[in-house]
A protein has these predicted regions:
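N-terminal signal peptide c-region/cleavage motif recognized by signal peptidases
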Residues: 17-19
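Short beta-strand/loop motifs in extracellular/secreted proteins, especially
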Residues: 73-78, 117
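Short acidic, gly/pro-rich beta-turn/loop elements at beta-sheet edges
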Residues: 58-60, 76, 131
Length: 141
């Protein structure tokens, strides 16, 4: 009969009780020739549509599409990174268009997604929180 040492038994028990937190995974795709990145939770979803090559002309066609369970028609969304960085983007019908957003705010939002980690999208009535791996190749400016 093999007897485990008390240290080994305690270590094994501790390893079993440590919760494993899975990162939220971006779903990456292409729509109408534009790269897309989507995150979904029970509380809503966010989809980023990028236009790094100006597929449809010189005007950027990027968009941040948001859906909140408790706030169907926000007019502003704030992207908050755990590091303290934040950016405000105007929203109309659930969409913040890159062409009409402030370029510096759009760049901060992209940097937050590119860096990964924990971040939240917040409206006056609802919020979505995600924790993702970095997206170092995200080209969405």
């Amino acid at each position: 009969m093999h007897v485990l040492s008390s240290v080994l038994a305690v270590s094994a028990f501790a390893a079993m009780t440590v919760p494993v937190h899975a990162l939220d995974a971006w779903t990456i795709g292409v729509e109408r020739g534009l790269p897309t990145y989507a995150l979904t939770s029970e509380a809503g979803e966010v989809r980023l549509v990028c236009d790094p090559d100006r597929v449809f002309g010189p005007t950027p066609n990027g968009a941040l599409v948001v859906r909140f369970l408790k706030d169907a028609a926000p007019d502003m969304v704030v992207v908050l990174a755990k590091s303290g960085e934040q950016t405000r983007l105007p929203v109309k019908n659930g969409i913040s268009a890159q062409a009409t957003a402030d370029a510096a705010d759009w760049a901060k939002m992209v940097a937050t997604f590119r860096t990964g980690g924990e971040f939240a999208l917040v409206t006056s009535a609802d919020s979505l929180t995600f924790e993702t791996a970095p997206l170092p190749d995200l080209a969405c400016e």
